[in-house]
Amino acid sequence: YNELFKDYTLNRKANLNVNGGGDIAQYYLSVSHNNDTGLLKVDPLNNFNNNIDIKRSNLRANINIDLTNTTKIAVKFYSLFERYNGPSVSANSIFGSVMQANPANFPKYFAYEDNLGYNHTLFGNKGNGGFPNPYADMVKGYKDRFTNTIFSQVQIEQDLKFITEGLKLRGMASVRTYTMNENSREYTPFYYGMAEVETELGILNYLYRIQEGTEFLNNPSVNNLGTSRFYYEFVTEYN
């Protein structure tokens, strides 16, 4: 566990709320920004960040206006912007690999100072390389995602008491949009094992390559999504 995760992390949060108004108009404004980071360690040979880093910015505004004694307008606006950075595989998969892996089978990687001349991390494994190495899964790539959610609503209420006492007309229209852009990149880990050979000097240990990998990130895997939803409502009330 300690080989993969840091002992602590720092998160930041900022909020600002403003409200006010008078007899004709009232308003409420809320702005917030959160920055949450994860506990995942980053491989020293990587030039990218695989640790979780989530930045969220939120804006909410409500405005109520009494145009006349019988006409009222309410406007609501909400937006959420989120930027996510994290490993190319899900956190659930990483924790699942941690539970399945046997720490006595092999090290997460073999130390660099003992293996000069390599330009990549020497991830540990054994056999044919089919054993889970949670550290390799965690640091082999990253995912970058940006999402944007916007909601707008306008409501108009008209009192028709000048026609008939108790008669009201209300109309409401809203739109919700959601967009998402996601990029994921990763490399294929090099897996190595440790073997023993008996020589005249005794038993020597040497590294052998189990799986060929790559020293570069693959082309981005791009996923885009955009949706819009409209809603209209018109109601006549008579009490």
Language model segments and positions:
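Individual transmembrane alpha-helix segments
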Residues: 138-142
